[in-house]
């Protein structure tokens, strides 16, 4: 039996995670992913830590045992890596119709996984988006699936989110329309990430969070929030914003005020991958890919565990992401999934909605391996 490895990487206090096979290559790019060159010849029988020094940085790699040849749990994430509903909805519906998708391994671009999208094995889909309008007229095509949306709607202007349509005229009505179509229990509002600078102050956030809450409160059950993590690429891309690192006191104040606003408008708040304890404000830790929500919506228990490849504070269950980094055209300065906006534009130019890959085509050097998958339903 062989195993795959989850590398937990801490760089100057920042947690980064990447799933990898036995061999990995260590170059200091891209920022949210660490590529390693250490070749591990033995089979892991337990978890252990190793230290690696490369390019002047010290890495702590926590290696966890997990079965490589086991069946993958079939919760689909669409996608933490890009905005599929906004830019790739036609491609998505083609993939659902053909009941499979191809996804390149971000650690080895010539290694491609073939993933079944059959309703018989897919136990749930989480859609991540800032604008679901391209999907709204085709929601009936999702009827065979258990799904919900993570819908990010912030109070930032175009200096931060340059390619998001008008919040008042487009995005808020889209949120309301989506909720009316599928139910407010399937539409999670995300106000995420929060950061402060000279323009986006405590008072600014609280003022406009209230405005948004007044328009969205009856269309959702909860709002998930988080504070900005300054990874290397986000620190670089947000330099023009002159972000001021928030203090714990500021975190506590804004969460207390947000919690009160949420109560006034009939929803609750939780936090995404934040270590801070906010229980005194009735704010819990979120499970953005949520076993309990899928069980409630699908009326069936699921045998699926917490995702070991996410940060310790993350409460998400294990899932398979069908997106690709550097393919989102939203252009949000705080985004961790686009290392280069120009690269994202180039990649989208070779998108083919009929291709099984999100962008590009299968080449002669590519190796396609079918993932072993099975439903994790217990009903």
Which ranges hold each PLM region?
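Cysteine-centered motifs
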Residues: 26, 36-38, 51, 62
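N-terminal [4Fe-4S]-dependent radical SAM core
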Residues: 61-77, 85, 115-119, 282-325, ...
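Local cysteine-cluster metal-coordination motifs and their immediate loop/turn environment
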Residues: 321-339
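Intrinsic-disorder-associated, low-complexity terminal segments enriched in Asp/Asn/His/Tyr and depleted
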Residues: 4, 15, 42, 46-47, ...
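Short Fe-S-cluster ligation motifs
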Residues: 338-341, 345-379
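Catalytic cores of enzyme domains
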Residues: 220-325
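Conserved AdoMet/S-adenosylmethionine-binding subsite of the radical SAM
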Residues: 76-255
């Amino acid at each position: 039996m062989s195993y795959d490895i989850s590398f937990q990487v801490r760089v100057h206090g920042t947690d980064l995670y990447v799933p990898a096979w036995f061999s990995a290559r260590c170059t200091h790019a891209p920022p949210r992913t660490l590529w390693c060159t250490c070749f591990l010849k033995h089979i892991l029988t337990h978890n252990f830590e190793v230290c690696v020094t490369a390019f002047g940085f010290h890495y702590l790699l926590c290696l966890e045992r997990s079965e490589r040849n086991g069946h993958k749990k079939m919760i689909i994430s669409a996608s933490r890596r890009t905005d599929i509903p906004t830019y790739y909805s036609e491609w998505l519906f083609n993939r659902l119709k053909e009941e499979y998708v191809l996804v390149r391994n971000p650690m080895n671009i010539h290694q491609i996984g073939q993933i079944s999208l059959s309703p018989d094995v897919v136990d749930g889909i989480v859609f991540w988006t800032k604008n679901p309008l391209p999907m709204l007229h085709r929601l009936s095509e999702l009827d065979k699936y258990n799904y919900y949306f993570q819908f990010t709607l912030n109070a930032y202007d175009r200096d931060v989110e340059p390619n998001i349509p008008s919040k008042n005229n487009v995005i808020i009505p889209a949120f309301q329309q989506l909720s009316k179509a599928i139910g407010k229990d399937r539409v999670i509002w995300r106000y995420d990430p929060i950061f402060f600078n000279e323009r986006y102050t405590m008072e600014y956030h609280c003022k406009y969070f209230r405005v948004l809450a007044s328009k969205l409160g009856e269309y959702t059950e909860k709002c998930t929030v988080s504070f900005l993590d300054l990874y290397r690429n986000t620190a670089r891309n947000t330099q023009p914003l002159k972000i001021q690192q928030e203090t714990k006191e500021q975190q506590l104040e804004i969460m207390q005020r947000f919690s009160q606003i949420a109560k006034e408008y009939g929803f609750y708040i939780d936090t995404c991958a934040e270590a801070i304890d906010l229980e005194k404000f009735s704010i819990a830790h979120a499970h953005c890919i949520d076993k309990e929500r899928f069980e409630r919506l699908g009326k069936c228990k699921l045998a699926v565990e917490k995702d070991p490849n996410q940060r310790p504070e993350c409460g998400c269950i294990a899932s398979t992401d069908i997106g690709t980094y550097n393919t989102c055209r939203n252009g949000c300065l705080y985004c961790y999934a686009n290392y280069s906006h120009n690269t994202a534009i180039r990649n989208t130019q070779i998108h083919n909605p009929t291709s099984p890959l999100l962008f590009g085509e299968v080449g002669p050097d590519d190796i396609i391996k079918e993932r072993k998958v099975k439903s994790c339903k217990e009903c």
